Curated annotation (Swiss-Prot):
It comes from Photobacterium profundum (strain SS9). Belongs to the PEPCase type 1 family. GO terms for cellular component: cytosol. Forms oxaloacetate, a four-carbon dicarboxylic acid source for the tricarboxylic acid cycle. The gene is ppc. It is an enzyme of class 4 (lyase). Keywords: Carbon dioxide fixation, Lyase, Magnesium. HAMAP family: PEPcase_type1. Its EC number is 4.1.1.31. This is Phosphoenolpyruvate carboxylase. One of its GO terms (biological process) is tricarboxylic acid cycle. The keyword Magnesium applies. One of its GO terms (molecular function) is phosphoenolpyruvate carboxylase activity.
């Protein structure tokens, strides 16, 4: 590995050595030697040594069944530790400038000055800053909570080892602690034995807040504040909350029968309990710190005659928070809740603490006010008494089913059979009516009752507890109006954002016309109070049409939605449903935001953070601070220095690229009879269904083909055999087509001058770097029928041609030339991923040969799937 990454290499080597010792202690020298042999042969095979490749295959095919699991676990754990070392390196003091780019906020102000952006405009943009990160389960997040805790502890040890003043014995103790943690991880289950429930997923999300975001948010705001003061001479307002967090865990019922109205209620109680518990810890600490006596009149009035007025106020809050926790615990456990004074409104926390803050400043103790107390005030504004807000998500047909069943009961006909015009007229009439629509005597079916119960659960909450109601597979104006009507009938006393999610190619293309129709309805315009949220789906559109066509459809949809809402003088918030992988919209945050259409971030940024990406971007406080800074700087830059509108000839060529790439993608995925059998044989798609990943079934329709697969297992399966097909298919072919038609210079101009296009190519480069045609070919040879080999060869040949086409447009000799750190990081992990790939192919072969399932083989297979996902760093 390059010399400039020596600190990282040293940590990887140390952690690997410690894991080796653990394996020796647990399984003896012979197994450790076997693991080392496989690792060395794999490294040599990757360098092109065909003789060692043959030896490696022979070694794996002759492994006895009882060695498969420990060998798979060894490489999986090596990858976990490599990831930790890499993640830590980005925040360590040894981080090279190629990795740790200059501070994103400082860099931004440099750009603003260079472009003569006025101080006034900058200050206004900061005040308007509104970033909402939506934590979603889709847990491709394979790591269990227990493992994540150990990984955080390992990170702390690496940090301690950087301290130059450590004595020899102190260093030994830290190294011993590292060895203990690695041994603990080795002797624990790597993967879950049962699927997580929606409650488990929600608790995982709360753990991320508790372990990382609770600490990261005040630190991010403290740093942001200092930079604003330095560059603009202005501080953040005390009540500013430029960042907020929402969750789908326990609220996303799209295709997940396990997320019921009862589950949603319980998750919201748990969320409040965790918030009360965390604030109680903060208040306890403040009781210790704020022993001061001098105060202003307001605090004196709140504290009465107490000698230590701040402590008196804090102790009262402590009692109420303790009561709140006890009452919520009773409700969670379905017990009678005691009648106690509790915190039920965020102002009950904010008002007394804000009074303490003001008093300390007025009494010459500003330095004390700006310590922990300021952090707690910042947390109150960010997390509130609910910790995270909850989104509700449901599929559009579930709402129309409710109204169809109701209209049939009322003798009005079948709503489902009406045309769109009649549906809208009926819904608007009922929305404007003051009388209730649901008859008391009506006894709906269980599925319909569940939708109604969910709307009731929403109506019971306070507005602050909720984010938005997202309608997946939204296609029409009536889809949006139907939800508004159901919420009205449930007695919802507040306006909740009802957010259509446009996710297929056709729906993205029609999205703006749906919003335009809604804006023409007087009732709707009056009700939404000049604010509209729309979600752009990345994963299903890419599965439907391929990444190039999907990316362009998303861009055009955003452009058109911005225009429609500007014409109607309505503020638009675009909600981005990105995934961790490229095939689901994943891209480095900064590049992705700056490649969006001009003015598309004026209404703020709302974006999903999914599964494993939550851990990589937000799982450690220091890493989370960096991620929040990147989001803030990119959003500010996009609003203050928007990218130029694309030239007409660029858009015309993108239309061609989109059409050609979509046709090419669909010709393979839909047009080839061999494709589905090949997909099922060459990837672990069928076996993935057995992995206890998330609480959702892997298919919307258990009997369907590829089209019924959720986007996550579709991408996940292809990332396992290293072909990563959905993340590139069609794109390179379209680029080569345009080169052949004489558009090479235009493509180069687009790459150089248009952030949207250059970001697309950069994403493709990263995908290409992660592919491995040799590994994909081995899966074919070991697992597929010979009749399917030509299809596999055709796809691999296409991949090689596509890489050349993209490098040609970029004028680069090698992939990821502009991102050497990213390329090094992928190479570093490949040392351990490739043996796991070869082992997985062997495990799949043996599993499929057996009539009866073998628990040993199945567990080893699950470990290999988890390990490759860890190594690829974006599972789905």
């Amino acid at each position: 590995m390059n010399e400039k990454y020596s600190a990282l290499r040293s940590n990887v080597s140390m952690l690997g050595h410690m894991l080796g010792n653990t394996i020796k202690d647990a399984h003896g020298e012979p197994l450790f030697d076997k693991v080392e042999t496989i690792r060395k042969l794999s490294k040599s095979a990757r360098a092109g040594n065909d003789s060692d490749r043959a030896k490696l295959i022979d070694e794996l095919q002759n492994l006895p069944d009882d060695q498969l699991l420990p060998v798979a676990r060894a490489f999986s754990q090596f990858l976990n530790l490599t990831n930790i070392a890499e993640q830590y390196h980005t925040i360590s003091r040894h981080c090279e400038e190629q990795i740790c780019s200059p501070d994103s906020i400082d860099s931004l102000f440099g750009k603003l000055n260079a472009n003569s952006i006025s101080q006034l405009d900058s200050i206004q943009a900061v005040r308007d800053l509104n970033i909402e990160l939506v934590l979603t389960a889709h847990p491709t997040e394979i790591a269990r909570r227990t493992m994540i805790h150990k990984l955080v502890q390992i990170n702390k040890c690496l940090s301690n080892l950087e301290l130059s003043e450590l004595s020899h014995s102190e260093r030994q103790r830290v190294e011993q602690r590292l060895e203990q943690l690695i041994a603990q991880a080795w002797h624990s289950d790597v993967i879950r034995k049962q699927r997580p429930t929606p409650l488990d997923e929600a608790k995982w999300g709360f753990a991320v807040v508790e372990n990382s975001l609770w600490h990261a948010v005040p630190e991010f705001l403290r740093q942001f504040d200092e930079k604003l003061m330095r560059h603009l001479g202005e501080k953040l307002p005390l009540d500013a909350s430029p960042v907020k967090f929402t969750s789908w865990m326990g609220g996303d019922r799209d295709g997940n029968p396990f997320v019921t109205s009862e589950v949603t209620r319980e998750v919201m109680l748990l969320s409040r309990w965790k918030a009360a518990d965390l604030f109680l810890g903060d208040i306890q600490e403040l009781v210790s710190e704020l022993s001061m006596v001098k105060c202003n009149d307001q605090v004196r009035e709140l504290a009465g005659e107490e000698h230590e007025p701040y402590r008196a106020i804090l102790k009262d809050l402590r009692t109420k928070l303790t009561n709140t926790r006890d009452v919520l615990a009773a409700k969670i456990n379905k017990q009678d809740a005691p009648n106690l004074a509790t915190i039920d409104d965020v102002d009950q926390l904010w008002t007394p603490l804000h009074a303490c803050y003001q008093s300390l400043r007025e009494c010459g103790m500003g330095i004390i006010a700006d310590g922990l107390l300021l952090d707690v005030l910042r947390r109150i504004k960010c997390f509130g008494i609910h910790l995270v807000r909850l989104d509700i998500r449901q599929e559009s047909t579930r709402h129309s089913d409710v109204i169809s069943e109701l209209t049939r009961y009322l003798g009005l006909g079948d709503y489902e059979q009406w045309n769109e015009q009649d549906k809208v007229a009926f819904l608007v009439r009922e929305l404007a009516s003051k009388r209730p629509l649901l008859p008391l005597a009506w006894q709906p079916s269980a599925e319909v009752q569940e939708v109604l119960d969910t709307c009731k659960a929403v109506a019971e909450q306070s507005r602050e507890a909720l984010g938005a109601y997202v309608i997946s597979m939204a296609r029409t104006a009536s889809d949006v109006l139907a939800v508004h009507l159901l919420l009205k009938e449930a007695g919802c006393p507040f306006r909740l954002d009802v957010c259509p999610l446009f996710e297929t190619l056709d729906d993205l293309n029609n999205g703006a016309s749906v919003i335009k129709e809604l804006m023409s309805i007087d009732w709707y315009r009056g009700f939404i109070q000049n604010h509209q949220m729309v979600m752009i789906g990345y994963s299903d559109s890419a599965k439907d049409a391929g990444v190039m066509a999907a990316g362009w459809a998303q861009y055009r949809a955003m452009e058109e939605l911005v225009e429609v809402c500007e014409d109607a003088s309505v503020e638009l918030t675009l909600f981005h449903g990105r995934g961790g992988s490229i095939g689901r919209g994943g891209a480095p945050a900064h590049a992705a935001l700056l490649s969006q259409p001009p003015r598309s971030l004026k209404g703020g940024l709302r974006v999903t953070e999914q599964g494993e990406m939550i851990r990589f971007k937000l799982g450690l406080p220091d890493v989370a601070v960096n991620s929040l800074s990147l989001y803030a700087s990119a959003t500010l830059e996009a609003n203050l220095l928007p990218p130029p509108a694309p030239k007409k000839e660029w858009c015309d060529l993108m239309d061609v690229l989109s059409e050609v790439s979509c046709e090419s993608y669909r010709n393979v995925v839909r047009g080839s009879e061999e494709f589905v059998p090949y997909f099922r044989a060459a990837t672990p798609e069928l076996e993935l269904g057995k992995l206890p990943l998330g609480s959702r079934p892997a298919k919307r329709n258990p009997n369907g083909g590829v089209e019924s697969l959720r986007a996550i297992p579709w991408i996940f399966a292809w990332s396992q055999n290293r072909l990563l097909l959905p993340a590139w298919l069609g794109a390179g072919e379209a680029i080569q087509y345009s080169i052949d038609k004489g558009h090479a210079q235009l493509l180069e101009d687009m790459c150089r001058e248009w952030p949207f296009f250059s970001t697309r190519l950069g994403m493709l480069e990263m995908v290409y770097t992660k592919t491995n045609v040799g590994i994909a070919e081995y899966y074919d040879q070991r697992l597929t029928d010979k009749s399917l080999w030509p299809l596999g060869q055709k796809l691999r040949d296409q991949l090689q041609q596509d890489i050349k086409a993209v490098l040609n447009v970029e004028n680069n000799a090698h992939l990821m030339e502009q991102n050497p750190w990213g390329a090094e990081a992928i190479r570093l992990r490949n040392i351990y991923v490739e043996p796991l790939n070869m082992l997985q192919a062997e495990l799949l072969y043996r599993t499929r040969q057996q009539d009866e399932p073998s628990p040993i083989l199945e567990e080893a297979l699950m470990v290999s799937i988890a390990g490759i996902a860890t190594g690829m760093r974006n599972t789905g």
